[in-house]
Amino acid sequence: MKSADRFSPVKMEDAFANSLPTTPSLEVPVLTVSPADTSLQTKNVVAQTKPEEKKPAKKRKSWGQELPVPKTNLPPRKRAKTEDEKEQRRIERVLRNRAAAQTSRERKRLEMEKLESEKIDMEQQNQFLLQRLAQMEAENNRLSQQVAQLSAEVRGSRHSTPTSSSPASVSPTLTPTLFKQEGDEVPLDRIPFPTPSVTDYSPTLKPSSLAESPDLTQHPAVSVGGLEGDESALTLFDLGASIKHEPTHDLTAPLSDDDFRRLFNGDSSLESDSSLLEDGFAFDVLDSGDLSAFPFDSMVDFDTEPVTLEDLEQTNGLSDSASCKAASLQPSHGASTSRCDGQGIAAGSA
């Protein structure tokens, strides 16, 4: 039944009809071709050809794989021809590459260790510099605060200082007690001037000069009235010393202007001394040897009568040995003659 159905004449006709070419339709054929259709077709063609042209990638062998022992012992410079020799060259190449890689890794390790040590040193140095920077910043801030504080104190002191300040309050040396004003002048009669002693102006009137020049041959003695002797002569200087102790003369009386002029302006005092010592006293200028012709206004009065040693002993109260020694003493060289003998020399030179 089934075979009969399969080969039935109706079905045979349908199959034959399907196999016959169909007649073309009456539609207008398309004369242009779309570029999109052609591009898609080319992409498909390229995609289909690529898998065929791609070669399988060479698989890398794992690291540390054990190499087989070479079967041949080919010299290094000889070219490998057989498969065993090529395998030997491959094994040698792998061993050389492994040794070079090990050397490179060791060199890199040393370089990394060196870089690590340098990095640690630089980090420590950087940390130290950061600490120093912090300290310097703190010090700078402290100094800035001090400067600001001192500036404020200076400005405050300038504002607090009075504008009108007298020189006496600033300097104690300019006080009115040291420098008086013009209206505070003291009259001269109220100023206590010290009265100088006669011994300050004439060293021959000092008692200490009686024991300083024992030499009798250097300066000859000048006697009053032209008298010379061992006991009857008395020098002008000794007269001044003897009169010093007389209570009748007022030694504390103030000196006159002429006395000061003769004391401080005696230009020829040394010359008169030398002329007196060389030529002696000129008594011929006196009227018959009268000493009253001298206009004495000093504190020393001369007497024309000769004075003996007995009178000196009674006046001064000296012993015999002291009186003899005082009579033979001479004034020292260059002694001042401004009072007792200066006027006599001046009169003699006139």
From Swiss-Prot:
InterPro entries in alphabetical order: bZIP (IPR004827), bZIP_sf (IPR046347), Hac1/HY5 (IPR044280)
> Metal-binding among the record's keywords?
no
Region Basic motif: list its residue ranges: 89-142
Residue ranges, compositional bias (Low complexity): 160-175
Any idea which UniProt keywords this protein has?
Answer: Activator, DNA-binding, Nucleus, Transcription, Transcription regulation, Unfolded protein response
SMART domains tied to this protein? BRLZ
- Region Leucine-zipper: list its residue ranges: 143-150
> What induces or represses expression of this protein, per its UniProt record?
By the unfolded protein response pathway. Accumulation of unfolded proteins in the ER leads to splicing of the hacA precursor mRNA to produce the mature form.
The record's subcellular locations are: Nucleus
What is one GO biological process annotated to this record? Answer: positive regulation of transcription by RNA polymerase II
Bias (Polar residues) occurs at 35-47, 196-211, 329-340
The record's Gene3D superfamilies line, in alphabetical order, gives: 1.20.5.170
Q: Which family does it belong to?
A: Belongs to the bZIP family.
Q: What is this protein called?
A: Transcriptional activator hacA
Which species is listed as the source? Emericella nidulans (strain FGSC A4 / ATCC 38163 / CBS 112.46 / NRRL 194 / M139) (Aspergillus nidulans)
